[in-house]
Amino acid sequence: MFDIGFSELLLIAVVALVVLGPERLPKAARFAGLLVRRARTQWESIKQELERELEAEALKRNLQNAQQVIHDAQAQLQSNQQDMDIQNSISILHEQTKRDIHPDHDTNTLEPSTAVHHVHVPPPSTSTHGNNGQEKSQ
């Protein structure tokens, strides 16, 4: 954590022994250990809180991204629905136009047996027409 080597730690111990003396050195070492332990605990606490905050921010971003995707999908779905409605309207208009231009053959056709009518045409009379279809003069 502090990147202190063995030789540096030994130097600090010798200076502490000279300054504090052999009677107060164990008490000072315990106090220093307590301070280091508290500092580490505080550091870990801050680190965990930061990680939770970062995780919460990541979740918030993911939620916003998911909401944006849902919003985009809803807009696309609505656009597709409008396209389908327009396509259905065009199809209906197309069918109506076809019926108007070409009347439905099912309602205007008759059965073949009833569709044929026998019409009697009288033969031409000989008194009014000549050989070549000209009128006779009297």
UniProtKB/Swiss-Prot annotation:
Gene: tatB
Composition skew (Polar residues), residue ranges: 126-138
Top-rank lineage group of the source organism: Bacteria
Name this polypeptide is given: Sec-independent protein translocase protein TatB
Mode of membrane association: Single-pass membrane protein
Record-level Gene Ontology MF annotations: protein transmembrane transporter activity
NCBIfam families: tatB (TIGR01410)
Name of a matching Pfam family: TatA_B_E
Assembly: The Tat system comprises two distinct complexes: a TatABC complex, containing multiple copies of TatA, TatB and TatC subunits, and a separate TatA complex, containing only TatA subunits. Substrates initially bind to the TatABC complex, which probably triggers association of the separate TatA complex to form the active translocon.
Protein task: Part of the twin-arginine translocation (Tat) system that transports large folded proteins containing a characteristic twin-arginine motif in their signal peptide across membranes. Together with TatC, TatB is part of a receptor directly interacting with Tat signal peptides. TatB may form an oligomeric binding site that transiently accommodates folded Tat precursor proteins before their translocation.
InterPro entries membership: TatA/B/E, TatB
Family classification: Belongs to the TatB family.
Keyword Cell inner membrane recorded: yes
This protein's record includes keyword RNA-binding: no
UniProt subcellular location: Cell inner membrane
GO cellular component terms listed in the entry, alphabetical order: TAT protein transport complex
GO biological-process terms attached to the record: protein transport by the Tat complex
This protein's UniProt keywords: Cell inner membrane, Cell membrane, Membrane, Protein transport, Translocation, Transmembrane, Transmembrane helix, Transport
Positions of the UniProt region annotated as Disordered: 116-138
Transmembrane segments: 1-21
